[in-house]
Amino acid sequence: MPAENQNTGQDRSSNSISKNGNSQVGCHTVPNEELNITVAVRCRGRNEREISMKSSVVVNVPDITGSKEISINTTGDTGITAQMNAKRYTVDKVFGPGASQDLIFDEVAGPLFQDFIKGYNCTVLVYGMTSTGKTYTMTGDEKLYNGELSDAAGIIPRVLLKLFDTLELQQNDYVVKCSFIELYNEELKDLLDSNSNGSSNTGFDGQFMKKLRIFDSSTANNTTSNSASSSRSNSRNSSPRSLNDLTPKAALLRKRLRTKSLPNTIKQQYQQQQAVNSRNNSSSNSGSTTNNASSNTNTNNGQRSSMAPNDQTNGIYIQNLQEFHITNAMEGLNLLQKGLKHRQVASTKMNDFSSRSHTIFTITLYKKHQDELFRISKMNLVDLAGSENINRSGALNQRAKEAGSINQSLLTLGRVINALVDKSGHIPFRESKLTRLLQDSLGGNTKTALIATISPAKVTSEETCSTLEYASKAKNIKNKPQLGSFIMKDILVKNITMELAKIKSDLLSTKSKEGIYMSQDHYKNLNSDLESYKNEVQECKREIESLTSKNALLVKDKLKSKETIQSQNCQIESLKTTIDHLRAQLDKQHKTEIEISDFNNKLQKLTEVMQMALHDYKKRELDLNQKFEMHITKEIKKLKSTLFLQLNTMQQESILQETNIQPNLDMIKNEVLTLMRTMQEKAELMYKDCVKKILNESPKFFNVVIEKIDIIRVDFQKFYKNIAENLSDISEENNNMKQYLKNHFFKNNHQELLNRHVDSTYENIEKRTNEFVENFKKVLNDHLDENKKLIMQNLTTATSAVIDQEMDLFEPKRVKWENSFDLINDCDSMNNEFYNSMAATLSQIKSTVDTSSNSMNESISVMKGQVEESENAISLLKNNTKFNDQFEQLINKHNMLKDNIKNSITSTHSHITNVDDIYNTIENIMKNYGNKENATKDEMIENILKEIPNLSKKMPLRLSNINSNSVQSVISPKKHAIEDENKSSENVDNEGSRKMLKIE
């Protein structure tokens, strides 16, 4: 049944009576059948700008309709190549430039309109680039000509006209409401609210105008009663009129309302609702204006002051949005024209009348279902602002800001479409107010149709492709349409009666006197509200005084904290100095350990070289003695055999002749004895000199070696002592670190950080307190709770910041502390290894020296024995009877030898030559061996002397006393002793060779 006020009836009610659970009898839905969004593409003809630019047509569409495929040539090719390379998009319907407005309505909006009459929520969206005909498609020519629409009328006028024609034919009771909102620069605006479009912030009755806000339906029950009472005062007419004010036809329809028995469940819900309404009405002041929607939907959870969603699913509703009741299409068209006048429109290079905002025209239908029940359905007609290229449209300043906001909201809409198509787990509805408003239409419980408008010109081919991409993706979005919920008729009738009584009372009070007046009850109610507000102001003042005193205490605490922070800063600086000192010591210790390690390696190599040199020297000495003995023995045996052979030959071949041979034999005998004595004397002198030199040089050499070993031992003891001191310093720093962790870690006051949070908290509290004083309609308890939450949140943030700061300060100290432990352990292990290695090396050197000393003593003893044996050789020669007998036989055989004397002399000369050769051979062998050995030893000694300066440069100061001179003093005696032994050996060899020649 239509409901009408004489002045069209402004309805400032912010509540929709269809959402509250207690006011809805039931919600009948069809099975959860998923339906895809219907997508249609409308391509206009080229406009004057595109024709003047001579931009060719690149979009291939039918002239009117018929095909479901649209292709666009973006390559610039022609003929078959253009058809092969063209991009193709498939949608549900395609309309060309020849398609009329009536055809668009019948094909796209008509099916949704029938579902809307049946009780479904429906949405029609127009999407596309600027200047492609979106507003023309949705609105067109909204005027009536002789009671008829023109051919250019858009979807909204046709829906309004067809709606009332259909309702009159069905002859059912109904109520129709309209609302018109605009989204401009991400701000919602009610286009039907004349006060919000003026310069004043208050309405004609002195009420403050409130901004539109979007809420989820799940938060509807949490709205406070103060907001409901404020919204009630803005109410004008939200229900059907009485019979006296209705037209005859409307009155006839109204009489058809009758009350029948309801099911028990419906009666119980109705009785509960009546009881709740009676309690709420008795508690409110009689003079205050009543909010129709709030009184209809009161529950135990409180009254609402916003337009609630139409169902109990997770939808959205808009707070402070006005809904206007209409009884015919003309009233709806008047509201549409009123809203369009206030819509943001500007001129750009691409469009002379470019819409700079998104608009949603909503039609809400309360249609009688059966008996006392009315079904609620909605139809949202959305005209989206067009996306545009700022450079091409020439938008500057405010126009550029508008274009950016439009493109941003459309970009978010594109992301929502992509997420729905990809079935993503997160749909970014909340990133834009546009997507929040369209949340039910995209993937929700609404039947939706999308009309994409495009331009055929090549100059806009890029935007056309983008529009078609989104349209083809939106075709894959699935919705689950549901029938609307129910509301009871008696609730509507009661609210109508209360609202009309209030309006008549105010009207009579106004007519009785000049100016604007109100009834006595209304005046008393206003006074009581003022007294309540005064009490709230007093409470706010007391709260401000309390906060001021608390602020003074906080200032004092802040001063104390500053002093504490200064002392802590001094301690921190001292601690930083200590840490730097410890770091320097650790670096120095690390370098020292590296130098010690390098020196240790070099010393080990030198020790190995010395051991190898001594071993090689001993080996060569033994080989030389063995070779010399073997060679001498071999030559002497050879010489002896030759002499015996010659003597035998002389004995066999000689003929005793009577010659004067006796003097010669005596001479030979004397000469032999003389040679033996000479050889004995020289041998004694040689061995005595050798023994004397060895006895004189050996003690010096061993004393020097022992002194150097003692020096090395003292140096190593000093080094070990210094290492121990460094380790004790490190241990002391470790104890200091432990003391810091025990006394200071997590015990810093961090008062400066707390003061910052306290200051910010105080500023926020002061700001919110000022807002609280200015907006005294809000409840003080809610304000205090919010302040408490804010303080707790800031304290939590401050605590977290203190903990994070303390951990950040401690982290480098902890890492250095752990590294110092590793360095201490490495230093300790390396020190022990170095000490053990040097001790073992010194022990080996000492054992080697002892062995060498024993060997030399044994050699001296052997040489003394050989000298004593040589002294006995002469006496043995004198007492040798065989020797004397031989000489006697020589005398007897003098005659025999006389004939062969020449041959014997010749043979003797040849043997003398052989002995000379033997001597030369022995001398060459000794020289070659001595030269090689001396060269090898000299080379080894030179290498050692070269390494000593390099080591002394890299050694620590406490080891610098071990230099090349000390090593030279150790090596030189050994070198001289070896050279003396070689010379003595050569002298002995030469003397022995000479004596052998003399003997021969």
Curated annotation (Swiss-Prot):
Regions of compositional bias (Basic and acidic residues) in chain numbering: 976-1000
Low complexity bias: start-end ranges: 220-242, 277-301
GO molecular function: ATP binding; microtubule binding; microtubule motor activity; minus-end-directed microtubule motor activity; plus-end-directed microtubule motor activity
GO cellular component term of the entry, any: kinetochore
Gene3D superfamilies: Kinesin motor domain
PROSITE patterns xrefs: KINESIN_MOTOR_1 (PS00411), KINESIN_MOTOR_2 (PS50067)
Subcellular location as annotated: Cytoplasm, Cytoskeleton, Spindle; Mitochondrion
Residues passing through the membrane, by range: none
Gene Ontology BP, a term: mitotic spindle assembly
InterPro entries reported for this sequence: KIF11-like, KIF11-like_kin_motor_dom, Kinesin_motor_CS, Kinesin_motor_dom, Kinesin_motor_dom_sf, P-loop_NTPase
UniProt-listed CDD domains: KISc_BimC_Eg5
Region called Disordered, residue ranges: 1-28, 220-248, 260-312, 970-1000
Claim: S-adenosyl-L-methionine is one of the keywords in the record: no
Keywords: ATP-binding, Cell cycle, Cell division, Coiled coil, Cytoplasm, Cytoskeleton, Microtubule, Mitochondrion, Mitosis, Motor protein, Nucleotide-binding, Phosphoprotein
Signal sequence residues: none
Positions annotated to bind ATP: G128, M129, T130, S131, T132, G133, K134, T135
Biased composition (Polar residues): 1-26, 261-276, 302-312
Modified residues (Phosphoserine): S972
Segments forming a coiled coil: 518-615, 860-904
Kinesin motor domain span: 36-477
Role description: Elongates the mitotic spindle by interacting with spindle microtubules to generate an outward force pushing spindle poles apart. Following spindle assembly, CIN8 and KIP1 apparently act to oppose a force, possibly generated by KAR3, that draws separated poles back together.
Other noteworthy facts: Present with 238 molecules/cell in log phase SD medium.
Family membership: Belongs to the TRAFAC class myosin-kinesin ATPase superfamily. Kinesin family. BimC subfamily.
Protein name: Kinesin-like protein CIN8
Organism of derivation: Saccharomyces cerevisiae (strain ATCC 204508 / S288c)
Gene: CIN8
